Amino acid sequence: MVLAVIPARGGSKGIPRKNVRLMNGKPLIYYAIHNAKNCPSIDDVVVSSDDEEILKIASSYGVETMTRDSELAKDAVTLDPVIYDAVCTMEKKKGIQYDVVITLQVTSPLLSSDTLDKALESFLASSDDTYISVVNKPHLSWTKKDGCYVPNYEKRLNRQQLPPNYLETGAFLITRRECMEVNSRIGKKVSVYEMPEREAVDIDAASDWVLCEYELKKKRIILRADGYKELGMGHIYHCLTLAYNLTGQEILFVTKEQHEPGLKKLQEANMPVHTIKSDEEFMEFVQEWKPDVVVNDCLNTEADYIKELKKYVKRVVTIEDLGEGADYADVVINALYEDHTRGDNYYWGSNYVCLRDEFFCATPSVFHEQVQNIVVIFGGTDPSNFTKRIYEMAKRIHKDYPEIKFHFALGVGYDQKANQIETDEIAGVYVEQNLKHISDLFGKADLAFTSQGRTVYELATIGVPAVVMAQNEREMKHTFAQMNNGFLNLGLGINVADETIETTFRWLVDTPQIRKEMQSLMMRHDLKSGIKRVIGLILEDEE
């Protein structure tokens, strides 16, 4: 038989009413009671307290309570006699003798029932007398001996190379009944049980309280996105931006293992990622991981897909979703489209643009009468290979515009070698792939060639007049990249003749007043507030 004893004195001075004060909407003592009741190996749970309010709240959660003698509630009294008294009282009441006794501290609300259950299982399978909960904190430390400071180590090493240094967390202590005495709960054969660092916080000060409450409010969020040549890398980059702005939440990317470009980019970004092979496998994983939110950045969804997902997760957010499934999502964020005929769960247009961090501190482009630098950027994979067409044009017209430099920013999924795109300084052509800080390149550009994806918002933020060609029919539905916002849109790129592209280029280079007006139209937009709105919608902080 296993007994869990939860000691909870009423006279907390550092944080008044600490044990019953609401922590993330529940009395602090709830978490210890919840863990004990959800541990299958624990037979009985008792709360020992000198405080009537604590006993009443504990009783409402369906556990045994006992009024602690006033002599055992004094400041100088240690836990040993308190726990011993509780065990003896329960044994007398139940007419039994317990085999194992667990002390559970109220001040460790981050301890999970899973960790407690595993610790107890390990203890029951061992020959140890006592388990003490610890966290491994290897650090270089010093002590004082004979009036001198001396190191607690033999050799200075990096923290990862130091030997284990186990600190007691106070979360729980498991011991065999025969090892218990009035003034001791620790037997001769002692072992430690290492618990996750996140769960090891012990509330002793107000700052500990704030940290625990923050951790308990943390949400588990899945970002579901793929990246490959035909689709492009925009969904991966967009979800990375979301992840960087969801600091403090528990984030996990989920992507299909067969789409290597997207997977590679996530790994390069050092993001936690789980791979799947199919939507069916994804649903199975969602049931296992139990997220609070799923953000689905995979274009159009089917109704059955979202309905199935909603069975396992409270909040489903879809991005750029024009499919039937969007009607069943909690939130649909379509920054690239506008269609206000659909439901109240849709959020449309540039108010919901998510700019990458680098664009919040980027310097706007300085306008020049004479074009000096042109940036060419067609996304992560450029499936229509517009890059090649502009590259050939740049070389062809160099004799007419020798002062102009073309800067090609190639995506990680673009095959530079196969397309023979390389730097040629004599022709004024400069090529870079997978740039880490694209805003620097935009900042010195006088003109840009781009497709009709999210890059148009980044160009608008910097104020770079741009010629736009859509990669596909879907991109043509994106509403922002039009002349009223500073873009010269040529439509579906595969239908645009090379002659038209060149004529457009020459006209813009030779008419600075048009470029200046385009820049002015771009700069009137405030695109930096969108990410805050989107994060609010994901976390359900804004509707």
Each predicted region: which residue ranges?
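C-terminal alpha-helical cap of glycosyltransferases
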Residues: 205, 527-543
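A short, well-ordered alpha-helix in the C-terminal region of glycosyltransferases
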Residues: 507, 513-528
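Short phosphate-binding loop-to-helix
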Residues: 52-102, 110-118, 277-289, 300-301, ...
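Acidic donor-binding loop of glycosyltransferase active sites
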Residues: 443-454, 464
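Conserved core of the sugar-phosphate nucleotidyltransferase
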Residues: 81, 85-86, 108-196
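A nucleotide-sugar donor-handling region in carbohydrate enzymes
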Residues: 186-204, 208-211, 328-385, 416
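Active-site and donor-binding regions of nucleotide-sugar-utilizing enzymes
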Residues: 83, 228-230, 238, 244-245, ...
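Donor-nucleotide binding loops and adjacent catalytic segments primarily
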Residues: 259, 372-445
